[in-house]
């Protein structure tokens, strides 16, 4: 088998895909890598300010108004979709609309049943409990959530051994909002306890243009229609990516240009970041080139690809692949990943026979 460190992508870019130790390269297009970097001022504060996801927003408006009229908390809801599409922002908005407190946490941070019980007993009437990456909850935590979601109560075990007894503690009515990138990893009993489930879609370019223009105004950055259009086109259908790129292009315009983000400035800055006209970065192109050059276009298993890229399998499946699939650059088959004709053309490779 050929050594992986002999692999080279097109256009003379040398790629280290051995996973060797070294400082990790920042990916400007990784929507999962910089949620905490989002400036609070850029977050929409109301459903009217939230751009895109129109059908979902209309449903949520109705749910909020109906719950207010009845004086009840919102039903538990599950928001699914790739990272960076606004699941956390929507939860913040809904909590504000209902006039209640938001208590955020994440699946990986909840290790023991006691952790979950402590959070649940701290909630007040109507509060929102937001669990990001809810698909990563362990079974013990889920067992605590079942009665909490269904009956607004938790079972507490007192004592040990034969003398142990269980008491039920009532909880205030609350709303659990779960966010996930991997609905398929969630258990059916947990899924069944959500009264409403929705999947957030990638954004259209015109929606991202609105987001870029709005946030450029908030940041005090002059931007032309052409500049906003280029940023939107290369943001992978993801608002969080658009915000990250806007900040990087702002820096470039300030230092190299006259401070205004026009089409030429945006193009130059994004090319410097390694972001091409489809919104692919160096790692995306490495992924596609690996399938095409090393594995004859596929099929190749995601486990093999993750090892070759030096990335965790979950990262490849949750971060890299969704946009490549959405863009028609790869296909998932029962035997593995396959590069499409579109991928060959984009990277400048001749399409193989039957490809």
Swiss-Prot record:
UniProt-annotated stretches for the region Large ATPase domain (RuvB-L): 4-203
Binding site for Mg(2+): 88
CDD domains to which the protein is assigned, alphabetical: AAA (cd00009)
Residue numbers binding ATP: 42-43, 84, 87-89, 150-152, 193, 203, 240
Chain residue ranges for the region called Disordered: 1-43
Keyword terms: ATP-binding, Cytoplasm, DNA damage, DNA recombination, DNA repair, DNA-binding, Hydrolase, Nucleotide-binding
Record-level Gene Ontology MF annotations: ATP binding; ATP hydrolysis activity; four-way junction DNA binding; four-way junction helicase activity
Oligomer and partners: Homohexamer. Forms an RuvA(8)-RuvB(12)-Holliday junction (HJ) complex. HJ DNA is sandwiched between 2 RuvA tetramers; dsDNA enters through RuvA and exits via RuvB. An RuvB hexamer assembles on each DNA strand where it exits the tetramer. Each RuvB hexamer is contacted by two RuvA subunits (via domain III) on 2 adjacent RuvB subunits; this complex drives branch migration. In the full resolvosome a probable DNA-RuvA(4)-RuvB(12)-RuvC(2) complex forms which resolves the HJ.
Protein name: Holliday junction branch migration complex subunit RuvB
Gene field: ruvB
């Amino acid at each position: 088998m050929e050594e992986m460190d002999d692999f080279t992508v097109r256009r003379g870019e040398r790629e280290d895909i051995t996973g060797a130790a070294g400082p990790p390269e920042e990916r400007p297009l990784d929507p999962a890598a910089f949620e905490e970097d989002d400036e609070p001022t850029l977050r929409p504060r109301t459903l009217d300010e939230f751009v895109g996801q129109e059908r979902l927003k209309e449903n949520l408006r109705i749910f909020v108004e109906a719950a207010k009229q009845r004086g009840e908390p919102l039903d538990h809801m599950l928001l699914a979709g790739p990272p960076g599409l606004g699941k956390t922002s929507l939860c913040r908005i809904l909590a504000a609309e209902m006039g209640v407190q938001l208590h955020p946490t994440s699946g990986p941070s909840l290790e023991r049943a006691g952790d979950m019980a402590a959070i649940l007993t701290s909630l007040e009437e109507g509060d929102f409990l937001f669990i990001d990456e809810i698909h990563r909850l362990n079974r013990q935590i889920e067992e605590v959530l079942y009665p909490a979601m269904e009956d607004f109560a938790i079972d507490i075990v007192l004592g040990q051994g034969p003398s142990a007894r269980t008491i039920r503690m009532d909880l205030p009515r609350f709303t659990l909002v779960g966010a996930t990138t991997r609905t398929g990893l969630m258990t059916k009993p947990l899924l069944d306890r959500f009264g409403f489930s929705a999947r957030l879609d990638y954004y259209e370019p015109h929606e991202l243009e609105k987001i870029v223009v709005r946030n450029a105004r908030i940041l005090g950055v002059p931007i032309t229609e052409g500049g906003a259009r280029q940023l939107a086109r290369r943001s992978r259908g993801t608002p969080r990516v658009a915000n990250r790129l806007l900040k990087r292009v702002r820096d470039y315009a300030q230092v190299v240009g006259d401070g205004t983000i026009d089409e030429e400035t945006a193009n130059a800055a994004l090319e410097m970041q390694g972001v091409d006209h489809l919104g692919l970065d160096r790692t995306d192109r490495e992924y596609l080139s690996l399938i095409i050059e090393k594995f004859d276009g596929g099929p190749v298993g995601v486990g093999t690809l993750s090892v070759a890229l030096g990335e965790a399998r979950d990262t490849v499946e949750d971060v890299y692949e969704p946009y490549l699939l959405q863009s028609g650059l790869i296909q998932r088959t029962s035997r593995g990943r396959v590069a499409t004709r579109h991928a060959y053309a984009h990277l400048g490779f001749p399409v193989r026979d039957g490809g």
